[in-house]
């Protein structure tokens, strides 16, 4: 398979420092809003990268569920591989690839668990099918056949046919406290624009990076 000639030019326009918000969360929200308005597929999908005890990196796609001045929030099974890795090393990075807009956002920071109240509030807002799936699946565990998972789901569906579904103790969220956010905008002739926001105490330093 020949891959060397697969390329394209970036022509959506550049990014200048004067166009950036002073706060990176404000800038991120602007870009996210534009990604949603452009009807991108899964605009809140992000790559979440963690490392295990041996320094081996792992990545997976997770949906962003909230972002504010306190950080970026996602939810997962607390018995999953990523949750175990974050228990060992809370350092984390997030990546949003908004290809149709020729944009990327890369975030580094530290993950911390959400409170039980925060978990309950979000879990109760999910569709019932998603709640059942969260309980049925022991994420990252080995299973011999899909039928086992489907059988457990149907069993739970019957069990909770009436009434509320309790928040499982092994399910919850993480908040990523941001250390840095990089905004990348594709440019002509591979002269891309990159701006890095780095947290310095209560302020943000902004640097342009070479592409």
Swiss-Prot record:
Gene3D superfamilies associated with the record: Electron Transport, Fmn-binding Protein, Chain A
Main enzyme class: oxidoreductase
Matches recorded under SUPFAM superfamilies: FMN-binding split barrel
EC number of this enzyme: 1.4.3.5
Reactions that this protein is recorded to catalyse: pyridoxamine 5'-phosphate + O2 + H2O = pyridoxal 5'-phosphate + H2O2 + NH4(+); pyridoxine 5'-phosphate + O2 = pyridoxal 5'-phosphate + H2O2
Cofactor note: Binds 1 FMN per subunit.
Pathway(s) of this molecule: Cofactor metabolism; pyridoxal 5'-phosphate salvage; pyridoxal 5'-phosphate from pyridoxamine 5'-phosphate: step 1/1; Cofactor metabolism; pyridoxal 5'-phosphate salvage; pyridoxal 5'-phosphate from pyridoxine 5'-phosphate: step 1/1
Cofactor(s) demanded: FMN
Coiled-coil residue windows: none
Superkingdom of source: Bacteria
GO MF terms held by the record: FMN binding; pyridoxamine phosphate oxidase activity
Binding site for substrate: 7-10, 65, 122, 126, 130, 190-192
GO biological process, one term: pyridoxine biosynthetic process
UniProt keyword annotation of Flavoprotein present: yes
UniProt keywords, alphabetically: Flavoprotein, FMN, Oxidoreductase, Pyridoxine biosynthesis
InterPro entries the UniProt entry points to: Pyridox_Oxase, Pyridox_Oxase_CS, Pyridox_Oxase_N, Pyridoxamine_oxidase_dimer_C, Split_barrel_FMN-bd
Record: residues binding FMN: 60-65, 75-76, 81-82, 104, 139-140, 184, 194
Protein family according to the UniProt entry: Belongs to the pyridoxamine 5'-phosphate oxidase family.
Subunit and interaction comment: Homodimer.
Role, per record: Catalyzes the oxidation of either pyridoxine 5'-phosphate (PNP) or pyridoxamine 5'-phosphate (PMP) into pyridoxal 5'-phosphate (PLP).
Protein name as it appears in the record: Pyridoxine/pyridoxamine 5'-phosphate oxidase
Organism: Vibrio atlanticus (strain LGP32)
């Amino acid at each position: 398979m020949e891959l060397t000639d697969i390329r394209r030019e970036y022509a959506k326009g550049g990014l200048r420092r004067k166009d950036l918000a002073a706060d990176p969360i404000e800038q991120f929200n602007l870009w996210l809003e534009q990604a949603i308005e452009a009807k991108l597929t899964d605009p809140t999908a992000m790559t979440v990268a963690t490392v295990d005890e041996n320094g081996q990196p792992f990545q997976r796609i997770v949906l962003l569920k909230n972002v504010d001045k306190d950080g970026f929030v996602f939810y997962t099974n607390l018995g999953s591989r990523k949750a175990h890795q974050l228990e060992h090393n809370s350092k984390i990075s997030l990546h949003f690839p908004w290809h149709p807009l020729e944009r990327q956002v890369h975030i580094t920071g530290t993950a911390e668990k959400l409170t039980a109240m925060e978990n309950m509030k979000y879990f109760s807002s999910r569709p019932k099918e998603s709640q059942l799936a969260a309980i049925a699946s022991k994420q990252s565990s080995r299973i011999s056949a899909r039928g086992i998972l489907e059988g457990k789901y149907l069993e739970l569906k019957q069990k909770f046919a009436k009434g509320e579904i309790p928040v499982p103790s092994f399910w919850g969220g993480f908040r990523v406290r941001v250390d840095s956010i990089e905004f990348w905008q594709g440019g002509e002739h591979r002269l891309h624009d990159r701006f890095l926001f780095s947290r310095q105490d209560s302020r943000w330093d902004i640097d342009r990076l070479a592409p």
